[in-house]
A protein has these predicted regions:
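Phosphate-binding site recognition
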Residues: 1-227
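A cross-kingdom feature that marks ATP-driven nucleic-acid transaction machinery
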Residues: 195-366
C-alpha cells in the first residue's frame, strides 16, 4: 500500500511512470493499493487521460463518511443522542475519536473546535489545502452559505465576485461533497431557476454556522458566550440535519406501504384566492420538508413534516400539514400519505404515519 500517494509524486514525479511500467510488463505479482486524501489529485492521477496510470486501476474506491446509523450501532448512545452528535461531528472517524476523549459535548466542542489551538479549530482550511493552495474562494463561498445565503447570485454578491468566476470553485465543492445543490421536488435539477446551495457535510455546516461568525468573541476569550449561543440555536441546526436524514431514510425505501422515489424538500409561492374571485389576491410562501412520489403508484405522494423539538400533539401537527397541502400544486389530484418525523413521541396519537429517531436510523441505506 502506498499512502498519501500525491505527496510521494510531489517528491518524485517519475513514480507513476515506474508503476505503469511494472503493471504493463505483467511483472506485478501482488495487489497494489494507492491511497490519498486529496480527492482532486487522486482523480487526476487515475482519471486524467494524459497521466501514466490512466486506465490501470482495476477498482476505484471513494471512501465516504460513515453514515449515522453505524455510530448508533458502535457507540452506547440513544438514537436521539447519535443524531445530535452526528450533526456536529458528521461521519469522519477521526472526529469521533477526538470527541471520545472528552466526557461531555461542551468540553469536546470547547477544546477541539472553539479553542484556537484545538485539533479541529482550522479543519476546513486543512481540508481545502489537501486539494488546492488557492483556498480563499473556497472559504468565502462556505462562509457565505453558512450565514444563510443559498442562491448562487446572492453568494457571489456576498463574496464580491461574478457567478462565472466562482463557478469552478463551486463545482469542486460539490464534487468533494462539501456542498450540494437542492431544487424543489418535481423540478429538473439542470433547468430549475430555484436552485439552492447548502453545505452537505455536518461538521462543516456546524463550523460555518456557529464558529466562523464567533471568531471575534473567541479571540477575546468569550467562549462561554459562544457556547450559550450554540445551545440556544442547536435544535435548529440539528433539525436541518434531521430533515436530510429523514429524506434519505424514505428515498428508495419501502415504508408506509409504498416504495418511494428520491425524497426532496419543496418550497415556493402559491396563489391565494378569495371566495368567488378568479384572480389571486396574494401569494403564500409554502415549504415541505419531505416530499416523494411512490414508485408503485405515480398518483400517490408522501408529504412529511420534520420536527426536532419538544413533544407536541400529533393531531395539531397533522392538521397544519393537511392545511398546507391544500395549496400545493404538486398535490392536486394525488393521493397523499401524510407523515410526521418527530424527535419525541407525540403528546397524543392520531391516524398518521410517523417515524422517530430509531426508525430513521434503521431505514438509512446500508
Amino acid at each position: 500500500m502506498l499512502d498519501e500517494f500525491p505527496y510521494l509524486v510531489e517528491r518524485d514525479p517519475s513514480l507513476p511512470s515506474v508503476i505503469q511500467s511494472i503493471v504493463d510488463s505483467g511483472a506485478m505479482r501482488y495487489n497494489l493499493l494507492i491511497c490519498g486524501s486529496s480527492q482532486r489529485m487522486m482523480q487526476k492521477i487515475v482519471l486524467d487521460g494524459s497521466e501514466p496510470l490512466y486506465g490501470r486501476a482495476s477498482e476505484k474506491i471513494n471512501l465516504s463518511p460513515i453514515r449515522a446509523q453505524y455510530w448508533w450501532h458502535a457507540l452506547n448512545l440513544s438514537a436521539k443522542q447519535v443524531i445530535e452528535e452526528y450533526s456536529v461531528w458528521g461521519g469522519v472517524p477521526r472526529y469521533w475519536v477526538l470527541r471520545e476523549q472528552y466526557s461531555s459535548f461542551d468540553d469536546a466542542l470547547e477544546n477541539l473546535v472553539l479553542d484556537e489551538h484545538g485539533a479541529l479549530a482550522e479543519e476546513p482550511e486543512a481540508l481545502f489545502l489537501d486539494d488546492t493552495n488557492a483556498i480563499a474562494p473556497y472559504i468565502s463561498i462556505m462562509t457565505a452559505i453558512g450565514q444563510g445565503n443559498a442562491k448562487f447570485s446572492r453568494i457571489a454578491d456576498v463574496v464580491g465576485h461574478k457567478v462565472s468566476e466562482l463557478a469552478p470553485v463551486m463545482k469542486n465543492l460539490i464534487a468533494m461533497h462539501y456542498v450540494r445543490k437542492e431544487v424543489p421536488f418535481g423540478e429538473d435539477a439542470e433547468k430549475s431557476k430555484k436552485t439552492l446551495y447548502v453545505i452537505d457535510d455536518p461538521f462543516l455546516d456546524f463550523y460555518y454556522r456557529f464558529v466562523v461568525p464567533a471568531r471575534p468573541l473567541l479571540s477575546i476569550d468569550r467562549t462561554d458566550v459562544v457556547l450559550q449561543n450554540i445551545h440556544d440555536h442547536m435544535a435548529e441546526h440539528v433539525g436541518h440535519i434531521w430533515e436530510r436524514l429523514c429524506q434519505i431514510a424514505v428515498s428508495g425505501n419501502n415504508v408506509f406501504g409504498h416504495t418511494w422515489n428520491v425524497a426532496a424538500h419543496w418550497w415556493g409561492k402559491v396563489p391565494v384566492f378569495k371566495e368567488g374571485k378568479k384572480t389571486p389576491v396574494s401569494n403564500r410562501e409554502l415549504e415541505f420538508d419531505v416530499v416523494a412520489e411512490s414508485m408503485d403508484d405515480k398518483d400517490t405522494i408522501l408529504v412529511g413534516e420534520c420536527k426536532w423539538k419538544s413533544a407536541d400533539h400529533a393531531e395539531r401537527l397533522l392538521a397544519q400539514l393537511q392545511e398546507k397541502v391544500k395549496y400545493a400544486s404538486f398535490a392536486k389530484g394525488k393521493k397523499i400519505v401524510y407523515a410526521l418525523f418527530l424527535r419525541e413521541q407525540p403528546l397524543s396519537i392520531t391516524d398518521c404515519k410517523m417515524m422517530f429517531p430509531e426508525d430513521v436510523l434503521k431505514n438509512l441505506p446500508k
